[in-house]
Curated annotation (Swiss-Prot):
Any one GO molecular-function label of the UniProt entry: EGF-domain serine glucosyltransferase activity
Name of the protein in question: Protein O-glucosyltransferase 3
The organism's taxonomic lineage, starting at the top: Eukaryota, Metazoa, Chordata, Craniata, Vertebrata
Swiss-Prot/TrEMBL Filamin repeat ranges: 19-129
PANTHER family per UniProt: KDEL LYS-ASP-GLU-LEU CONTAINING - RELATED, PROTEIN O-GLUCOSYLTRANSFERASE 3
Recorded family membership: Belongs to the KDELC family.
Natural source organism: Mus musculus (Mouse)
Length: 503
């Protein structure tokens, strides 16, 4: 997957002047959406606007002329439904182009990128078929080829860290312990086996409805690449489960969870929230890892100079935010939008109106406070262009390890005791605050690309499979989780032999 050098992203040293105009031939186009083999729910690529002197725009280009993109089947005889919304302006001279295919283009695609009447960069781009859509079940048999296509990183620090506790995985120990330790009526654990790229599962405990989210991402991954055979348990609850230390007897069990903590040993996967929004982007959800990049509100100079928070009452510090806001309205605008845990506080603190997430970015500073565990909004806040003030927390998600305080965000104490001080600092050090916000945004754009989520998932399953001490099996009570077999999944997979050849 072609990408611009990090230096170009971080500091476009030669920037176009205020009166410059976009040069279509000199502008750049890159990204996985220009590769046939990079199968994603929503395919996407980037445009960098460049002027006639070869200088990059670092803010939205002037004038009314917009980039226009047409994606169509290479063959006029092949009808393929493709949804192509307008390119998203990321307010930094770059644009994000998305398209969702509802059928496979067996002959291929033609992508035309225009600025005015002129073709951009090397447009038109020809993607030789087949170009598969999300629901085509056609996995790449060679995982190395698939990982190279998506430019998967050589390693993920959080994965390496998580597996230090598990040089070997004893499936027999897990089969004995997990049902008794975590599978009671209050449990939210699902037991999975993947064999021959088919997914089987059984539920343990009463609260396992969220298995729909683990099912959908595993099925999506299995449609793209052949998965290793393995047997594992996923925790669908909020809190990580395994608190045994490495030297304990018996030792810790490798439970897979969506959130980790400093005192637990769970293996972490990207949250169901980011995977579901990735799968349903441009269809069932409006707020996803791509759409937020083109909806970051006013430019930095025009944002309201206050810290901002809206959310449920899922942690007491959130109530403290509202009290601080009432006492310091010139620094902080905070409100609770729904009461469940502290219903008795609603009369005292009031209830704020719901507002669209993209409107959060009208404010210069975003306060990120834990909910029951790590706040699911954090990745989306980091993709905006506001400065994130992040509460110190024992909880973390899969990408936190790459983010550093004072480089990507501004830390605030667990008890919020220094929040107002940090807001004042940001107001008094505007350029430094802006720099931290931009550094955080660029790093989040890299860490939270949809291909990185798939790469991460695969790498966890691969590492786990390598450590199994015995063969995975389909256990009593397990059922097959089928791939979609309705009209949405129709395609001819070139990797599968025709049925006549198999007879």
């Amino acid at each position: 997957m072609q990408a611009l050098p990090l230096g170009l992203q971080l500091a476009l040293l030669v920037a176009a002047g205020a009166g410059a105009r976009v040069s279509a031939p000199r502008s750049l186009a890159w990204g996985p959406g220009l590769q046939a083999a990079a199968v994603l729910p929503v395919r996407y690529f980037f445009l960098q606007s460049v002027d006639s002197d070869g200088r990059n725009f670092t803010s939205s280009p002037p004038g009314q002329t917009q980039f226009k993109v047409v994606v169509k089947s290479l063959s006029p005889k092949e009808l393929v439904r493709i949804y192509v919304p307008k390119p998203l302006d990321r307010n930094d001279g770059t644009f994000l182009v998305r398209y969702r295919m509802h059928e496979t283009a067996h002959k291929g695609l033609k992508i035309e990128i225009l600025h005015g009447s002129e073709h951009v960069a090397h447009s038109p781009y020809i993607l030789k078929g087949p170009v598969y859509h999300e629901y085509c079940d056609c996995p790449e048999d060679d995982p190395q080829v698939w990982q190279e296509t998506l430019s998967c990183p050589a390693s993920e620090p959080q994965i390496e860290q998580d597996f230090v506790s598990f040089p070997s995985i004893n499936l027999q120990q897990m089969l004995k312990e997990v049902p008794t330790r975590f599978g009671d009526e209050r449990g939210a654990v699902v037991h999975y086996t993947i064999l021959n790229n088919h997914i089987y599962r059984r539920s343990l405990g009463k609260y396992t409805d969220f298995k729909m989210f683990s099912d959908e991402i595993l099925l999506s991954l299995a449609r793209k690449v052949t998965l290793p055979d393995l047997e594992f348990y996923i925790n669908l609850g909020d809190w990580p489960l395994e608190h045994r230390k490495v030297n304990d007897t018996p030792g810790p069990i490798p439970i897979i969870s969506w959130c980790g903590s400093l005192d637990s040993r769970d293996i972490i996967l990207p949250t169901y929230d980011v995977t579901h929004s990735t799968l349903e982007a441009m269809r069932g959800v409006t707020n996803d890892l791509l759409s937020v990049q083109g909806n970051t509100g006013p430019s930095w100079i025009n944002k309201t100079e206050k810290a901002f928070f809206r959310g449920r009452d899922s942690r007491e510090e959130r109530l403290q935010l509202v009290l601080l806001s009432k006492e310091n309205p010139q620094l902080l605008d905070a409100g609770i939008t729904g009461y469940f845990f502290f219903q008795e506080k609603e009369k005292e603190l009031g209830k704020a109106k719901l507002m669209g997430f993209f409107d959060f970015f009208k404010y210069k500073y975003q306060v990120n406070v834990d909910g029951t565990v790590a706040a699911y909004r954090y990745p989306y806040l980091m993709l905006g262009d506001s400065l994130v003030l992040k509460q110190e927390s024992p909880y973390y998600e899969h990408f936190y390890v790459a983010l550093k305080p004072w480089k990507h965000y501004v830390p605030i104490k667990r008890n919020l005791g220094d929040l107002l001080e940090k807001v004042k600092w940001a107001k008094e050090n505007d350029e430094e605050a802006k720099k931290i916000a931009k550094e955080g945004q660029l790093t989040a754009r890299d860490l939270l690309q949809p291909p990185r989520l798939y790469c991460y998932y695969y790498r966890v399953l691969q590492k786990y499979a390598e450590r199994q001490a015995s063969k995975p099996m389909i256990r009593d009570g397990m059922e097959l989780v089928p791939q979609p077999d309705d009209g949405t999944s129709i395609c001819q997979c070139h990797r599968r032999r025709p049925e006549r050849e198999e007879l």
